[in-house]
Amino acid sequence: KVDAVVGQTWAAVSLAINELCKRDSFPYFPVNVAPLDSFKKGTLADCTFAAGYTPWTVGYMAASAAINDLGKKKIYFLGRSDSWGWDIQAGVETAAKEYGGTIIGRDEVSQGTSDFSTVLAKVKAAKPDVFISAQFGGDAIALLKQCYDMGLNKEMTIFNSFVTNVVAKGLPAEARDGIYGMTYFYYDMTGFKDQETVKLAAEYSKRFIDKYGTPPDAYATIAYIATQQLFQAVETARSFEPKAIQKAITDNPDFMSVKGPGKWRKDHEPVYEYAGFLVRGKGPKEQTHEWDLFEVVSVQGGEKVFPTLKSLGY
């Protein structure tokens, strides 16, 4: 007997599971960065709650951090030809307009692109302050390597909108040195302003390392928070009954997580005080051990980095 479902990083599959949960009424906690349309009123099942956020938020945070934290206002944007890329682009455009940035050039490539040389030649010629890209996973590794090989790192700030330990590990340390990105979670929060969050992140990371031998990455942490939220709701409701779990979360929207405070909204998406951490890649001279990949520089969060409820039909 299945009482609840947690998981799935692929957008199409998570939406398909959500549709089944509408029909069969299961609590569902997906663990991906889901398309913006997923959160439009009427899309999610009554007891589907997503612990991640949307690519729109990723793009908004990336542009906001580039402009406000790094002082880089002339942006060249490279998107991806799918909802991931389009949502990130919409977020970048919104933040750029809000904070006085200018998108001086943009391009778009399909997922799986391996040769970025033509695009990067255009980026180099445009001379932006910052090059923000929507690529992820293997695509991001290929892109960031080629940025380094073509010398872009010396001429502008390289900013991959959403990074993980896996992407960073796939790069030579020299290519990782000085690049920026937003991440959902980084295991080493040394020097961060909120000591309670630092403590919770450190304790969680130690448990994870003790069990698996590597530090937790962003998506492992989305899954951890999703599962934790499910169990907290079950304990409050004293039931796995979907309506009882929904009521437990709706009546008690505030929670503390290993990445700081969060609060569930009407769209079943949590607003995090620290939604994304701005990280800077460490090069060979700074890196002290295998997983010493980034330094946390700043943070983006709060209601302002999320799409408005009105825009989602609420």
Spans of model-derived segments:
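Extracellular/periplasmic periplasmic-binding protein-like sensory domains
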Residues: 147-224, 235-236, 240, 291-313
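Hydrophobic alpha-helical
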Residues: 11-22, 128-150, 226-229
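Extracytoplasmic ligand/sensor domains, especially the bilobed periplasmic-binding protein
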Residues: 2-106, 157-181
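Structural motif
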Residues: 1, 58-61, 108-122
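Short hydrophobic/charged patches on amphipathic alpha-helices used for structural packing
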Residues: 18, 63-64, 117-121, 141
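Solvent-exposed, acidic/polar segments of extracytosolic/periplasmic ligand-binding ectodomains
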Residues: 177, 250-314
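Surface-exposed patches in mature extracellular/periplasmic domains of secreted proteins
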Residues: 7, 77-80, 215-222, 243-245, ...
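Sec-exported extracytoplasmic/periplasmic mature domains
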Residues: 1-2, 18-26, 67-72, 93-101, ...
